[in-house]
């Protein structure tokens, strides 16, 4: 019996303790506001809920609030920490821009008796003391857009929003779809302010839309500044902040949605007091629930027929299965995918693209920049096309043939791509142009420098050949190298595009613009910037290799093949401009200046390179002549020739000196009989050890020539033209002279084939131990 009484007493004591403890437990609310508490908008309604909840629950100590927290993340962090220090145990993070910050501090104090209401769109499964606050703002903007489509007299409606980086564009698109449902031929203008709360900028943004014909304007700003602009112009405003606009503006506000967060605050404050907080909860509301969001009455200035049609659409929205703002097929045009009858909710909320047929009131690049770059680039493209025609028409000319016509055409094609990229750089930025202009410039320079580098790499290999090894380096053997360089460039560009999130976005406060002016600029993520720097390193390596090859071909003693000077000059100019462009990209000056310098550098480097590489060749064709089918003569002694001469002397001992080709031409083209005069045919062919000779033939002869050995190459032709100075009857001396003559033929043939048939890429050097 005593034990039973003791148990009853214990239970009673625990109950009494809990009751007393519950009566002593209090709730202290702290509200974080993004803007001004008196903005007569979203922040006003949130602060009003705090005041009413405090009054109805007789809260003591009093609740607290912090405002203007959008201006500084540090201020927002200080506000949360200060709330904790002052004993707040229900902290309301009212703005979606502070969602991550709220989660951070909720995680930090998850073991403390502190509860959170955070505005956001997704639950946090690791934080049971956090309630996510959200409401369907898309249906509200759709309904107001529907009214706007009915009410507009100009057929033009507008929308003002913070823009990408602050919020998605789903509200903008919902307003537009609503207007389109009411009036199919609607014109939609959209403008971004870069902030939830900046009354001065918002007012001027609305004025710009009005100047472009908009007479009804929606918005997702936290204050009524946009609607003030439309009312000041004589139009009817919309209540788009949750505040009853007619309280202040009377009948000038045509239609409004209203919010009341008092019940939300009271409900969760009671959970704190009663210690029965619902873990992992969320508070999502919409028009159909009628617990926090409502539609206000129409102004008497709104025609009855418009009121009636809008009310019918409101009744349709009460059915949650009706959601045209995320089921219209036009949403597929911006890459959103349907999941059943609707767009996937996650994609819809995260969308950052505006629907087609919209306008932006922005400050564009100067027309002088656009026209100047376009005209100069167009002229340069014309010169490149003319140069390509000349190369094709006179590909048999000595100076063109020595430069590999096919690679000359590829180099000119790369230059054309660069000039097209310059034109794209001077255009108004869009998502497509932001990507394409970098692709065009990068691929253009890769094609230009890659072909130039590979073409001269072949020259280096052929002339840096002291042992006269047989080397057949055709164009088909060079194409994979060029393709490999281009593929590397494409891979880096693909990584940049995949990771960079490259988009065109509107920005304020740049290029010395006033706070009322906006400009579209290209933007990318940090990963995109890293890939872009990797691309610059890749092009820097190409320039270094090109410099190295141009240095190595300085030893080439045939003028037509030695392009070291123009290549070195071109590479120097490009490198110099690159060292100008990189600091500009890092320091980020005004966008207009940046674009201008990049275009000028690209135009100058490319045009000067064309003049250096092709202008000199065309000038020589005019002054010297085409020299069709002629061989290439040098009057300098190369290192490989010196070694061959020494080898010849050591094998011949003190034998007679070999007289060779001199400056005469050995022409193996199809038209050799027509080009060479009879006198030249009968002239003995002499060989001078100081001279080298090269010959180019047609494509057919290229394939045929490779089948013959050097001994069959021109033995009969040379034997018929050699005049022996001494004809000794002594059989032994005659035998020695025959051996010397044979040695002479071998040396001459090797020299004659020092360079071979490059028109079709066939290059062959026969190796004979002379």
UniProtKB/Swiss-Prot annotation:
Residues 639-740 are annotated as: Disordered. Glycans are attached at residues 24, 185, 260, 286, 319, 344. Gene3D superfamilies: 3.40.50.2300. Induction: Down-regulated by Pseudomonas aeruginosa, PAO1 strain and PA14 strain infection. InterPro entries: GPCR_3_C, mGluR/GABA-B-like, PnrA-like. It is found in: Membrane. Residues 676-693, 730-740 have a biased composition (Basic and acidic residues). One of its GO terms (biological process) is G protein-coupled receptor signaling pathway. Residues 1-22 form the signal peptide. The keyword Signal applies. The chain crosses the membrane at residues 371-391, 406-426, 443-463, 484-504, 529-549, 566-586, 595-615. Residues 715-760 form a coiled coil. One of its GO terms (molecular function) is G protein-coupled receptor activity. It comes from the Eukaryota. Residues 392-405, 464-483, 550-565, 616-770 are cytoplasmic. It is a multi-pass membrane protein. Residues 23-370, 427-442, 505-528, 587-594 are extracellular. Keywords: Coiled coil, G-protein coupled receptor, Glycoprotein, Membrane, Receptor, Signal, Transducer, Transmembrane, Transmembrane helix. One of its GO terms (cellular component) is plasma membrane. Its main location: membrane. In the N-terminal section; belongs to the BMP lipoprotein family. PANTHER family: METABOTROPIC GLUTAMATE RECEPTOR-LIKE PROTEIN A-RELATED, METABOTROPIC GLUTAMATE RECEPTOR-LIKE PROTEIN C-RELATED-RELATED. This is Metabotropic glutamate receptor-like protein F. It comes from Dictyostelium discoideum.
């Amino acid at each position: 019996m005593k034990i039973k009484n003791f148990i009853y007493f214990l239970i009673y004591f625990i109950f009494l303790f809990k009751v007393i403890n519950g009566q002593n437990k209090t709730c202290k609310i702290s509200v974080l506001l993004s803007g001004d508490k008196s903005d007569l908008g979203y922040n006003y309604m949130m602060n009003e809920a705090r005041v009413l909840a405090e009054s109805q629950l007789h809260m003591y100590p009093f609740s607290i609030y912090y405002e203007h927290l959008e201006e500084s993340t540090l201020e927002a962090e200080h506000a949360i920490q200060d709330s904790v220090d002052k004993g707040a145990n229900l902290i309301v993070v009212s703005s979606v821009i502070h969602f991550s910050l709220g989660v951070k501090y909720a995680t930090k104090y998850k073991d403390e008796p502190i509860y959170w209401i955070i505005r956001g769109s997704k639950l946090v499964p690791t934080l049971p003391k956090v309630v996510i606050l959200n409401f369907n703002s898309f249906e509200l903007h759709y309904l107001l857009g529907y009214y706007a489509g009915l009410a507009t007299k100009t057929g033009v409606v507008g929308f003002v929003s913070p823009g990408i980086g602050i919020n998605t564009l789903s509200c903008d698109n919902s307003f537009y779809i609503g207007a389109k449902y009411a009036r199919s031929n609607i014109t939609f203008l959209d403008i971004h302010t870069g902030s939830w709360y900046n009354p001065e900028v918002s007012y001027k943004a609305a004025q710009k839309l009005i100047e472009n014909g908009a007479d009804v304007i929606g918005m997702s700003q936290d204050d009524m500044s946009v609607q003030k602009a439309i009312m000041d112009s004589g139009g009817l405003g919309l209540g788009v902040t949750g505040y009853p606009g007619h309280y202040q503006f009377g009948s000038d506000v045509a239609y409004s949605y209203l919010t009341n967060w008092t019940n939300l605050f009271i409900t969760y404050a009671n959970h704190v007091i009663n210690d029965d907080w619902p873990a992992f909860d969320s508070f999502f509301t919409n028009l159909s629930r009628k617990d926090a969001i409502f539609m206000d009455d129409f102004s008497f200035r709104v025609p009855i027929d418009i009121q009636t049609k809008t009310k019918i659409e409101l009744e349709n929205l009460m059915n949650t299965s009706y959601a045209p703002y995320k089921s219209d097929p036009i949403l597929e045009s911006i890459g959103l995918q349907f999941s059943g009858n609707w767009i996937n909710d996650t994609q819809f909320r995260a969308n950052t693209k505006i629907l087609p047929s919209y306008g932006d009131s922005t400050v564009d690049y100067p027309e002088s920049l656009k026209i100047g770059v376009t005209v100069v680039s167009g002229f340069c493209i014309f010169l490149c096309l003319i140069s390509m025609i000349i190369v094709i028409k006179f590909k048999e000319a000595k100076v063109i043939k020595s430069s590999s016509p096919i690679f000359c055409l590829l180099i000119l094609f790369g230059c054309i791509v660069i000039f097209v990229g310059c034109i794209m750089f001077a255009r108004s930025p869009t998502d497509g142009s932001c990507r394409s202009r970098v692709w065009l410039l990068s691929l253009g320079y890769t094609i230009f420098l890659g072909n130039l580098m590979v073409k001269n790499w072949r020259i280096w290999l052929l002339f840096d050949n002291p042992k006269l090894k047989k080397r057949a380096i055709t164009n088909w053997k060079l194409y994979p190298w060029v393709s490999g360089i281009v593929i590397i460039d494409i891979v880096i560009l693909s990584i940049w595009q995949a990771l960079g999130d490259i988009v065109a976005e509107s920005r304020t406060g740049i290029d010395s613009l006033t706070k009322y002016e906006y400009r579209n600029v290209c933007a990318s993520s940090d990963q995109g910037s890293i890939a872009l720097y990797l691309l610059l390193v890749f092009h820097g390596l190409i320039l270094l290799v090109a410099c190295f090859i141009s240095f190595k071909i300085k030893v080439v003693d045939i003028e037509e093949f030695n392009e070291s000077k123009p290549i070195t000059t071109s590479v120097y100019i490009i490198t110099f401009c690159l060292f100008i462009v990189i600091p500009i990209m890092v320091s980020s000056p005004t966008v207009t200046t940046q674009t201008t310098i990049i275009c000028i550098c690209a135009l100058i480097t490319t045009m000067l390179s064309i003049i250096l590489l092709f202008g000199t060749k065309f000038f020589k064709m005019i002054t010297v002549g085409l020299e069709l089918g002629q061989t290439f003569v040098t009057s300098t002694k190369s290192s490989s020739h010196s070694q061959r001469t020494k080898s010849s002397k050591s094998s011949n001992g003190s034998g007679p000196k070999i007289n060779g080709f001199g400056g005469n031409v050995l022409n193996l083209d199809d038209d050799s009989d027509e080009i060479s005069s009879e006198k030249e045919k009968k002239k003995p062919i002499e060989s001078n050890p100081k001279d080298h000779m090269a010959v180019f033939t047609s494509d057919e002869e290229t394939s045929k020539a490779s089948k013959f050995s050097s001994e069959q190459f021109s033995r009969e032709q040379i034997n018929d033209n050699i005049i022996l100075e001494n004809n000794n009857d002594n059989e032994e001396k005659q035998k020695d002279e025959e051996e010397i003559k044979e040695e002479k033929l071998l040396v001459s043939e090797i020299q004659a084939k020092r360079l071979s048939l490059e028109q079709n890429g066939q290059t062959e050097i026969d190796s004979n131990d002379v």
